Amino acid sequence: MYSCTSPSGIEVSLNKPEIWEKFYPKTEMIVTRKRGRVIFPHLDYNVKGLDPDSLYSIYIHLERVDGIKYKFDAGEWKEAGKGDPILPIQYKEHPRGKRTGTEWMSEPVSFAHLKITNDPENKDQKLILAQSLHKYIPVLHIKQLDPYKGTFQMDFHGVEFRLEATQFIVVTAYQNEELTKLKVHHNKFASGFRSNGKRRLSSESENSENSPPKRSASAISSLTPPAISPPMDYTQQNPYFFNQNFFSTPQSHQPQFAAHSANAQNYNNFGAQNGAQFDWNVYYQRQWYWQQQMMMSGGIGQPQMLNNGFPNL
């Protein structure tokens, strides 16, 4: 229930099983459309039995447990009818990318950044799609690097681990009062409820758990424009070196500037007021070129310590 061992000897267990034990089997997870909601208790795993020197990549996805849609009635969850059509699987790679077995086993493998949403149009890489009033179980995948090809086999889905205690029902509002109290007690960032059990105002609960509060428009407008542009998102350039999901369509290798066009224009306008103009596209192209040179010089098969879009992880 709290741990699982594969035939090859790889063992996966929950880092804090005592917390999951208090929630199971009535665990509920809030889902929101815009910003998503962090999964709590967090999906933190301990991994043992890996080859210390081999490279591995770890993924996670949410799997529907059954074809049933549920309802909360008389203090318990009951079958409400046939479930909605099952959605395609979304594999989410751990932001640390490829690491040796020693590195993965040295500390918990945490997916605390992962949020669930019910908006199929939301493309945020930290969000994973789930359907309300359906039961899910997180599935952990561990993929080993092919030592002969120097890359992952595209048809190899790795070893899968399902821990029964992590099952949960997706809801838009907590149904179980006792579970609500547990959430507030164990999670100081619990959104939607104050510590006294009362609901927060909509303006208070809009931010998801662990998310920083929004800044006011007046505060943002008063900021002085930065001297340089924010760093480019290089994760869109090369699907091999940048921890891309191997189950998704490879991204273009050409630099993309659309995400920064508005900022570049603003900064150019700011520079014009001071009698200067700067070609931001040329700046990005040069930065992208030298970044590519640095990556290629590192050699294939070496862990790439690059920006993966998830700070502090």
Swiss-Prot record:
Keyword Acetylation: no
GO cellular component, one term: chromatin
Entry GO MF terms: DNA-binding transcription factor activity, RNA polymerase II-specific; RNA polymerase II cis-regulatory region sequence-specific DNA binding
Disulfide linkage: none
GO biological process, one term: cell fate specification
UniProt keyword Nucleus, yes or no: yes
The protein's name: T-box protein 37
Keywords: DNA-binding, Nucleus, Transcription, Transcription regulation
Organism, scientific name: Caenorhabditis elegans
Subcellular location: Nucleus
Stored Pfam families: T-box
SUPFAM superfamilies per the UniProt record, alphabetical: p53-like transcription factors (SSF49417)
Binding region for DNA: 19-195
InterPro entries hit by this protein: p53-like_TF_DNA-bd_sf, T-box_DNA-bd, T-box_sf, TF_T-box, TF_T-box_CS
Gene: tbx-37
Principal location class: nucleus
Sequence segments annotated as region (Disordered): 193-228
Its job: Transcription factor. Required for mesodermal induction, acting redundantly with transcription factor tbx-38. Together with tbx-38, acts by inducing cell fates in the AB lineage, thereby playing a role in development of the anterior pharynx.
